[in-house]
Amino acid sequence: MAEGTEVVARNKKAQFEYDIEETLEAGLVLEGSEVKSVRQGKASLDGAYCQVDREGEMKIHGMYIKPYEEAGPFGHEPRRNRKLLLHDQQIGKWGQMAEQEGYTIVPLSLYFRDGWAKLKIGIAKGRQKHDKRQAIKEREMERRLEREQSDYNF
């Protein structure tokens, strides 16, 4: 991330369940109470995904933003679909990629950059169970090698 960014939420499962092929930064349309709640760190990307709708707009589905307590009855709906701000060419390209078999668009992180809410999204291909096991084995081998090297290089 660049300077001036404040990461609010990460989708840790996305790195494990998917192979991320390409990433993109998108703006996020939020209501006032949602911005205040996100600034307090009360947002979750677990189970969220992005999809292009009939009007040609990309929206994020399933993202949870806790209602802001001070908003009272004028607060927001916690799991509403939120519009992503992207160029039409980007929406078209990513929409076509997501229509391919086994591909989806997943949110990777939610952050503020220069005061604006941004969402890092990735085009991802789902992993099979054996792929996940292989990734775990590789990660464990790397950790073990680093540990052994650090023992010899005090």
Curated annotation (Swiss-Prot):
Respond yes or no to whether keyword RNA-binding is given for this record: yes
**What GO MF annotations does this protein's record show?**
RNA binding
Q: Which GO terms describe its biological process?
A: trans-translation
> InterPro entries, per this entry?
SmpB (IPR023620), SsrA-bd_prot (IPR000037), SsrA-bd_prot_CS (IPR020081)
Could you list this entry's UniProt keywords, alphabetically sorted: Cytoplasm, RNA-binding
- Which locations, inside or outside the cell, does it occupy? Cytoplasm
Q: Which Gene3D superfamilies match?
A: 2.40.280.10
| Region spans: Disordered | 129-154
A cellular component term from Gene Ontology for this protein is:
cytosol
**PANTHER family in the cross-refs:** SSRA-BINDING PROTEIN, TMRNA-BINDING COMPONENT OF TRANS-TRANSLATION TAGGING COMPLEX
Summarizing the function annotation, the protein's role is: Required for rescue of stalled ribosomes mediated by trans-translation. Binds to transfer-messenger RNA (tmRNA), required for stable association of tmRNA with ribosomes. tmRNA and SmpB together mimic tRNA shape, replacing the anticodon stem-loop with SmpB. tmRNA is encoded by the ssrA gene; the 2 termini fold to resemble tRNA(Ala) and it encodes a 'tag peptide', a short internal open reading frame. During trans-translation Ala-aminoacylated tmRNA acts like a tRNA, entering the A-site of stalled ribosomes, displacing the stalled mRNA.
What name does the UniProt record give this protein?
A: SsrA-binding protein
Q: Which organism is it from?
A: Salinibacter ruber (strain DSM 13855 / M31)
